[in-house]
């Protein structure tokens, strides 16, 4: 019954955050029954309990459900990578299809670009793609220097792998799909020991310089509303006149944001992160 109660709470969270509609409730419960290899379900009495979808509740529910999955041998290991793969699968069941998210984003955009990004940023947190509980652990402070104040940040949102997870990732079958951790192919991907799960990840398509691009948020939030804008095709990074055209094309569409560009040198990366 505790498992059924946690399933009910997770579904109630999805309803509260409008990730699913009331018409989706039974369907969603049945999806979770399949995951946990249950053949039947009795609606538990959870009246009077705090199940309003507050962010502090979600990690607790997911932790308990993941513990149950380990106890029932649904997942074979209890390391952080395996746990993240599993709880992302759970959240993927609650996450609307890409077409639904895009439609809602564009509806908000007609009101204002800012409303559209506010919706999408909140959505990316509600689906646990951006893990609020981990982002809260990040350390940030300012240091005085002869050159002005320097922002120092220690990002703790990205979990450290334990030795077992590192060994499992090393021994995992190598794959070239998705081609990288940012590209379009990640949307909805189940993940593996050496690649994060992205069932709860959604991408907003944009037209930048007459080409298909994607817009998403970083799950690790190095900066406020830290977003990523990326080419729909895998092409080498190149800083030229067209690169500046693309930057300005984006800020014309989203004038409340600013955008930087990675260096076009191998491995260097860069952007505003340097």
Describe the residue ranges of each PLM region:
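Active-site microenvironments that recognize anionic phosphate/pyrophosphate groups
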Residues: 1-237
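Coil-to-beta-strand transition motifs
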Residues: 222-224, 254-256, 270-271
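Histidine-centered divalent-metal-coordination microenvironment in nucleic-acid enzymes
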Residues: 226-231, 264-274
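Short Pro/Gly-enriched beta-strand edge/turn motifs at strand-loop
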Residues: 186-187, 258-260
């Amino acid at each position: 019954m505790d498992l059924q109660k946690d399933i009910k709470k997770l579904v109630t969270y999805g309803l509260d955050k409008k990730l699913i509609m009331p018409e989706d409730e039974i369907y969603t419960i049945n999806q979770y029954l399949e995951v946990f290899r249950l053949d039947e379900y009795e609606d538990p009495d959870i009246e009077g309990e705090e199940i309003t979808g507050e962010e502090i509740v979600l990690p607790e529910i997911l932790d308990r459900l993941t513990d149950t999955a380990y106890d029932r041998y649904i997942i074979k290991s209890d390391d952080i990578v395996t746990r993240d793969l599993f709880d992302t699968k759970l959240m993927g069941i609650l996450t609307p299809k890409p077409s639904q998210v895009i439609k809602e984003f564009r509806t908000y955009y007609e009101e204002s670009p800012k409303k559209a990004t506010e919706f999408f940023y909140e959505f990316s947190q509600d689906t646990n793609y951006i893990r609020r509980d981990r982002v809260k652990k990040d350390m940030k402070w300012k240091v005085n220097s002869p050159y002005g104040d320097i922002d120092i940040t220690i990002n703790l949102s990205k979990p450290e792998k334990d030795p077992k997870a590192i060994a499992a990732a090393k021994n995992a079958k190598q794959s070239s799909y998705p081609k990288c951790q940012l590209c379009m192919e990640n949307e909805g991907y189940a993940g593996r020991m050496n690649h994060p799960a992205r069932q709860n990840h959604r991408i907003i398509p944009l037209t930048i310089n007459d080409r298909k691009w994607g817009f998403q948020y970083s799950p690790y939030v190095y900066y406020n509303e830290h977003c990523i804008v990326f080419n729909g095709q895998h092409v080498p990074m190149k800083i030229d006149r067209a690169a500046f055209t693309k930057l300005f094309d984006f800020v014309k569409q989203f004038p409340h944001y600013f955008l930087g560009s990675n260096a076009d040198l191998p491995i260097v990366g860069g952007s505003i992160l340097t």
